[in-house]
Every structure is written in C-alpha cells, then in structure tokens.
Amino acid sequence: MKIASNITELIGRTPLVRLNRIPLLEGCGAKIVVKLEGMNPAASVKDRIGINMINRAEQEGLIEPGKTLLIEPTSGNTGIALAMVAAAKGYQLILTMPETMSQERRAMLKAYGAKLELTPGSEGMGGCIRRAQELAESLPNAYMLQQFDNPANPQIHQQTTALEIWQDTDGAIDFLVAGVGTGGTITGVASVLKEKKPSFQAIAVEPQNSPVLSGGKPGPHKIQGIGAGFIPEVLDVNLIDEVIAVTDEEAIAYGRRLAREEGILSGISTGAALAAAIKVAKRPANKDKLIVMIQPSFGERYLSTPLFQDLE
C-alpha cells in the first residue's frame, strides 16, 4: 500500500512546471521553469528544513518529544513548517515573528497549535532573533533550532532539492534563480549542481531596499521571506555567481501576473524570483538555456498583503 506513515513523509519531491505566457509576452529567449515548493504539505520550501532540523537534533540527543520546548525566530514559513512537524511529533513550540508579517501566517501558526510572540517590525529579523534567544535562555527545557546558523538547513537541500532538480531536468539546468532568506536553498542546491555541471550558475535574489548581498545597507522592504538584513551563517556567498536586486513593486507585479497569467498562486518572494528570472532569460547569451526558479511558498498566506490587495 502506498500510504505515508505521517505527514512529514510527504515533504519534498515537488514538481517542475514550465512558464508559458509570461516568458512569451516578455520576449524571453531562455526557458523558465518553476520548482513548486508550495506543493509541500505545509505549502513552502521550509517544510524541508523543518523536518531535517528536528530530526538531526533528535538524532544528536538534543531534543525529545513531550519534553523539549522548541523555540525559533521566523518570518513565517519556517514557523509554519516547524508547527506542522511539532504537531506531528508531539513538541511544544514558541515562535517569534516580526509584527509586519501577514495575518494568514499568524492564523496558520495558531491553527497548528504553536504559540506566537510578535516583535517590533522596525527591528526586522534581528529583533525577532534576539527575542527568541532571550526565551531560549530563560525557559526550562528550551531549545532553539536556529535556521540561520543550522547546517541541517543547507544539508537537506543538498540531499533532496538539488538532486530532484538535477533528475527532473535530466541535468539540463543552466541557472538556478532563488531568493535568499537564510540562504539554505541556494547554498545547498548550488553546492551539488556546481560539482555536477561546472557551467551551472546560481543567481541570488534580494530586495533592492535591503541589498546586503550586494554590499549595501539593510532596510525595510515588503518582500516577506527574503532580505533578512544580514548575511546568514549558512549562506555560502562563494557559490553565488550573481546577485539581482528586485524592487517591492516588481515583486508584487510579477507575483500577481504569475497567478493571473500562469495559474500559479504564490507569495511575494516568488514574484521577486520571477522578476529576476525574466531579466536573466532576456539576455541574448542565454537563448535556449534552462532557468529553474524556486517558488518558496503557495499564495494563500499572502491574500491580506499588498500582493493581492486592491485587485480588480
């Protein structure tokens, strides 16, 4: 019988889908395909690191279901993934999250049974991380998973995401375009694919209003899920061939178009990735090349945000 023993066994093995109408209208010479991470059980790429960080901590004897209180700072999707895994395994979970994150994120976290503590939006992810550290130090039997520093984050992308992309493209991938939050996805995938195909290039996407990877200063922006305002420990910048900065307006516009012209409902960071992918696909040197862009999350948790507001 083909029956998963629990929900976490359904994480990964997400499909690729080719974009048709948008690249045609934009005059793209390269092919753009999307890795639909929104088809994971809790609807984001973070499901992968959620299960791997918890599994590794269990294997190392650091945490135990029913005894350990898990704590994590999150912009939303990692929190949702951890809440799903914690519910399935029997952990209590406290999440710290900037108050600027969407209402749907908050509702989903509570639906899974997680406790949520909001931090000032002006402090960004830095304030969120500091509060999580305070809780981890003050509460009994608490353990902080630390997605920004945890090697289990890029590891799962080396073991799963990279190989899925390689196999599903028959090794034909030329470019990966991925937004950088923790940097785990681009680090894990690029580290594997660069060994398999030396000509492969990894392109990082960041907010133009917080261009830290490009050497700029951190700042407030509307692209939830990327642009943490610092360079995370798990991000290997040496694997990045190019950084493309995207405006809030571009991310919103392309996120909307993806839903309306391709039928793919996604979050704002997917819109940012698409904006960058189109720039790469339009370059004459990239004619007939294959670009794989990551869809980090499904769009239902963004319906209250500027991405899907004021639609006609």
UniProtKB/Swiss-Prot annotation:
PROSITE patterns reported in the protein's UniProt record: CYS_SYNTHASE
GO CC annotations on file: cytoplasm
Residues of the signal peptide: none
UniProt keyword Transferase present: yes
Enzymatic class: transferase
Enzyme Commission number(s) from the entry: 2.5.1.47
Reactions this protein catalyses: O-acetyl-L-serine + hydrogen sulfide = L-cysteine + acetate
Record GO terms (molecular function): cysteine synthase activity; L-cysteine desulfhydrase activity
Domain of life: Bacteria
Cross-referenced InterPro entries: Cys_synth (IPR005856), Cys_Synth/Cystath_Beta-Synth (IPR050214), CysK (IPR005859), P-phosphate_BS (IPR001216), TrpB-like_PALP (IPR001926), TrpB-like_PALP_sf (IPR036052)
Keywords: Amino-acid biosynthesis, Cysteine biosynthesis, Pyridoxal phosphate, Transferase
Transmembrane annotation, as ranges: none
Entry's family note: Belongs to the cysteine synthase/cystathionine beta-synthase family.
PANTHER family to which the protein is assigned, alphabetical: CYSTATHIONINE BETA-SYNTHASE
Protein name per the record: Cysteine synthase
